[in-house]
Amino acid sequence: MIMDKDTFIGFACSYTPLALVHAAGFTPCRILPDGDCPDQAGHLLHDNLCPHVKRILDRALSRQIPDLTGMIFMNSCDAMRRLYDAWQVARPDIPCILVDLPTTVSERNIAFFFGELQRLAGVLEKWGGARLDPEKLAASLQLFARLAGQFEKIRARVQAGDLRNGATMLQAAYLKASVTAPEPMIGELETLLSQESAGQADDGVPVYLFGNVLPETDAFALFAECGARIVGEDLCTGSRLFTEIRVDDDSPDSLPDSLLKNYAKGLLNRQPCARTMISDRPGELAADIIRAARLSGAKGVIGHTVKFCDPYIARIPNIRAALKQEGIPFLMLEGDCTVRSIGQQKTRIEAFIEMLR
C-alpha cells in the first residue's frame, strides 16, 4: 500500500473512531459547518433541518472541502442519516459509509458496534487503507490518548485563567486538531503548553458551556467580550472529540478483535451527548452538566444548540429544571452555525453575565 501522508477521510461526528481511521493510514479530517457557501442544501433536504447538516452539504455542493478519499457518517440522528443520503447525490465522486451507532450502552450494543467497526475497517481497506492490525491500532490509540492528555492540561490552565484569551485559543486548537494528523498536532500542543503562566490573565465571570455544534472561535471571543470566562465546556466541536477513551485490553492475546471490541466499548462509554440514552438514569445528562459546572467553579451555565436538534429539544426542559433546583443560573441559546446568529444573542449574554456578577 502506497499512500500520501495527507490522504484524508472526512467525518462529522465526535463518535467517529479516529484511531481506527489513523491506523488504516489516513488522516481524519472533520468537515465543519463553516465557510462562506451559497445556501443550496434546500434542493436536497428540508429547510427545517439541522443547520449543522445543511452547512456541511452546502460545503460539499460548493466543493469547498478538502480532497477526501472517503467520508464517514455516524448514524447519530435522523438529520445525519439524511445527510448520508444527500451526500451520495451531491458528491458521488467521494464514497461514503454510514456506521450505525447504538443509543444505549449494553453488552449486546457493544457487540453490535464492534461489528460496525469491523465493517468500517473493511471499507477503509477497500478505499486503499491498511488492513486492520492490532499493533497499528494500539499505536494510534496511544497517539490519540497522548493528544487528549495534552488537551486536558491546556483545559486545566484555561480553567485557572492563566492563559490570555484561553477559551478562544483552546477552541482554535480543537479546530486545528480536528483536521490535522495527531503526530504534528502533539508537537504544536507541547509548544503551547510551554508558554509561561500569565497569572490571572482572564478575569471574567466563570461560566460553564454545553451543547452540540459551536466551532467558531469568534463565538468564544464574543463570550469574553460580554464578560464571560469559559472555565469548562462539553461541545461536539470542542472537548468531546479530544477526551481520552478508556480502552482496557484485558485479553491475554493480541488478536485485533480483542482490542477493537474494547475500543468499541470505550467509544460508547465516553461522555454522552443528548442522543445517547442511559436507560436506568434518564436524567444523567443534566446531572453531568451540574457536576461539571460545580467542578469548574462556574457561577452559571450557558447552553448552545443548533436549531431543530430534536435530541436536545427533548432534553433541555429536564436540564433547565435540574439547574433551577440546584440554584444554578442558566441561559439557553440557539444558533444556525453562523457567527451572525451568536452575535444576535450578545445583549442576552451581557445581561446574563451582569446578573452573575
Residue ranges and their predicted role:
Residues 60, 280-297, 314-315:
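A short, acidic, amphipathic alpha-helical segment used as a generic capping/interface helix at domain edges
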Residues 37-46, 105-110, 239-247, 341-344:
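Short, charged, surface-exposed secondary-structure boundary motifs
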Residues 317-357:
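Peripheral docking tails and interdomain loops at the edges
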